[in-house]
Swiss-Prot record:
Matching PANTHER family: 5-DEMETHOXYUBIQUINONE HYDROXYLASE, MITOCHONDRIAL (PTHR11237:SF4), COENZYME Q10 BIOSYNTHESIS PROTEIN 7 (PTHR11237)
Residues reported to bind Fe cation 2: E94, E146, E178, H181
Coarse class of the protein's main subcellular location: membrane
Protein name: 3-demethoxyubiquinol 3-hydroxylase
Length: 215
């Protein structure tokens, strides 16, 4: 029989600080799975295509920074232990996406967004508030967020140059994982958000995508 470890409030704050550092510091996280891009060939692309792909991958990287913060904020305030554990497990899986995107960005000779700390803080706060309201709302927010991420991934897959199989392999695996996270959150009892709430979330997402494409 397994025993569940109980953390003090100070312990949890230290864990959150550690998670933030691992998310925001370059190459500080290690993926649990190797990047899908490894087995894909290196190809020559025009400077314009390289800049565009780097911008898309920067958006996706910041999206994963937000996902990390969202899950950590929810884990901090989740009421049921099993929900807290689910959030922490999902955050671990998202580390793969975070590192894959960062690796690809650097391969393209570019940089991650300087706005990541700002978006991390905002997302952490949103996640913590959602967790305080109820676990049902918290899980529903995960599902709605992941569906929004899948929408962006589909759009980015359409914009990638045909020859860029490395970025494509990463985004396709990310889409599979995000769809699974969304369905798992709903199956666990997540609230299905109404259309107006989803619309508001999409507007916030546009702010993130427009700003991080270049910086």
């Amino acid at each position: 029989m397994t025993t569940q470890r109980h953390y003090s409030p100070i312990d949890r704050l230290l864990l959150q600080a550690d998670a933030a550092m691992r998310t925001l510091l370059p190459f500080s996280g290690q993926p649990y799975r190797p990047s899908p891009a490894i087995v894909q060939p290196d190809v020559q692309m025009s400077d314009e295509d390289i800049r565009h792909v780097a911008g898309l991958m920067r958006i996706n990287h910041t999206g994963e920074v937000c996902a990390q913060a969202l899950y950590q904020g929810q884990a901090l305030t989740a009421k049921l232990p099993q929900v807290r554990e689910a959030m922490e497990h999902a955050a671990e899986e998202e580390i793969d996406h975070l590192v894959w995107c960062e690796q690809r960005i650097h391969q393209l000779g570019s940089h991650t967004s300087v706005l990541n700390p700002l978006f991390y803080g905002m997302s952490f706060g949103i996640g913590a508030v959602a967790g305080l309201i109820s676990d049902k709302v918290s899980l529903g927010f995960v599902a709605a967020t992941e569906h929004q991420v899948c929408k962006h991934l589909n759009e980015h897959l359409e914009q990638l140059p045909a020859e860029d199989e490395k970025s494509r392999a990463i985004l396709e695996q990310m889409r599979i994982d995000e769809e699974h996270h969304a369905e798992s959150a709903l199956e666990a009892g997540g609230f299905r958000f109404p259309a107006p709430v989803k619309f508001g979330m999409s507007l916030l997402a546009k702010v993130m995508t427009k700003s991080t494409y270049r910086i």
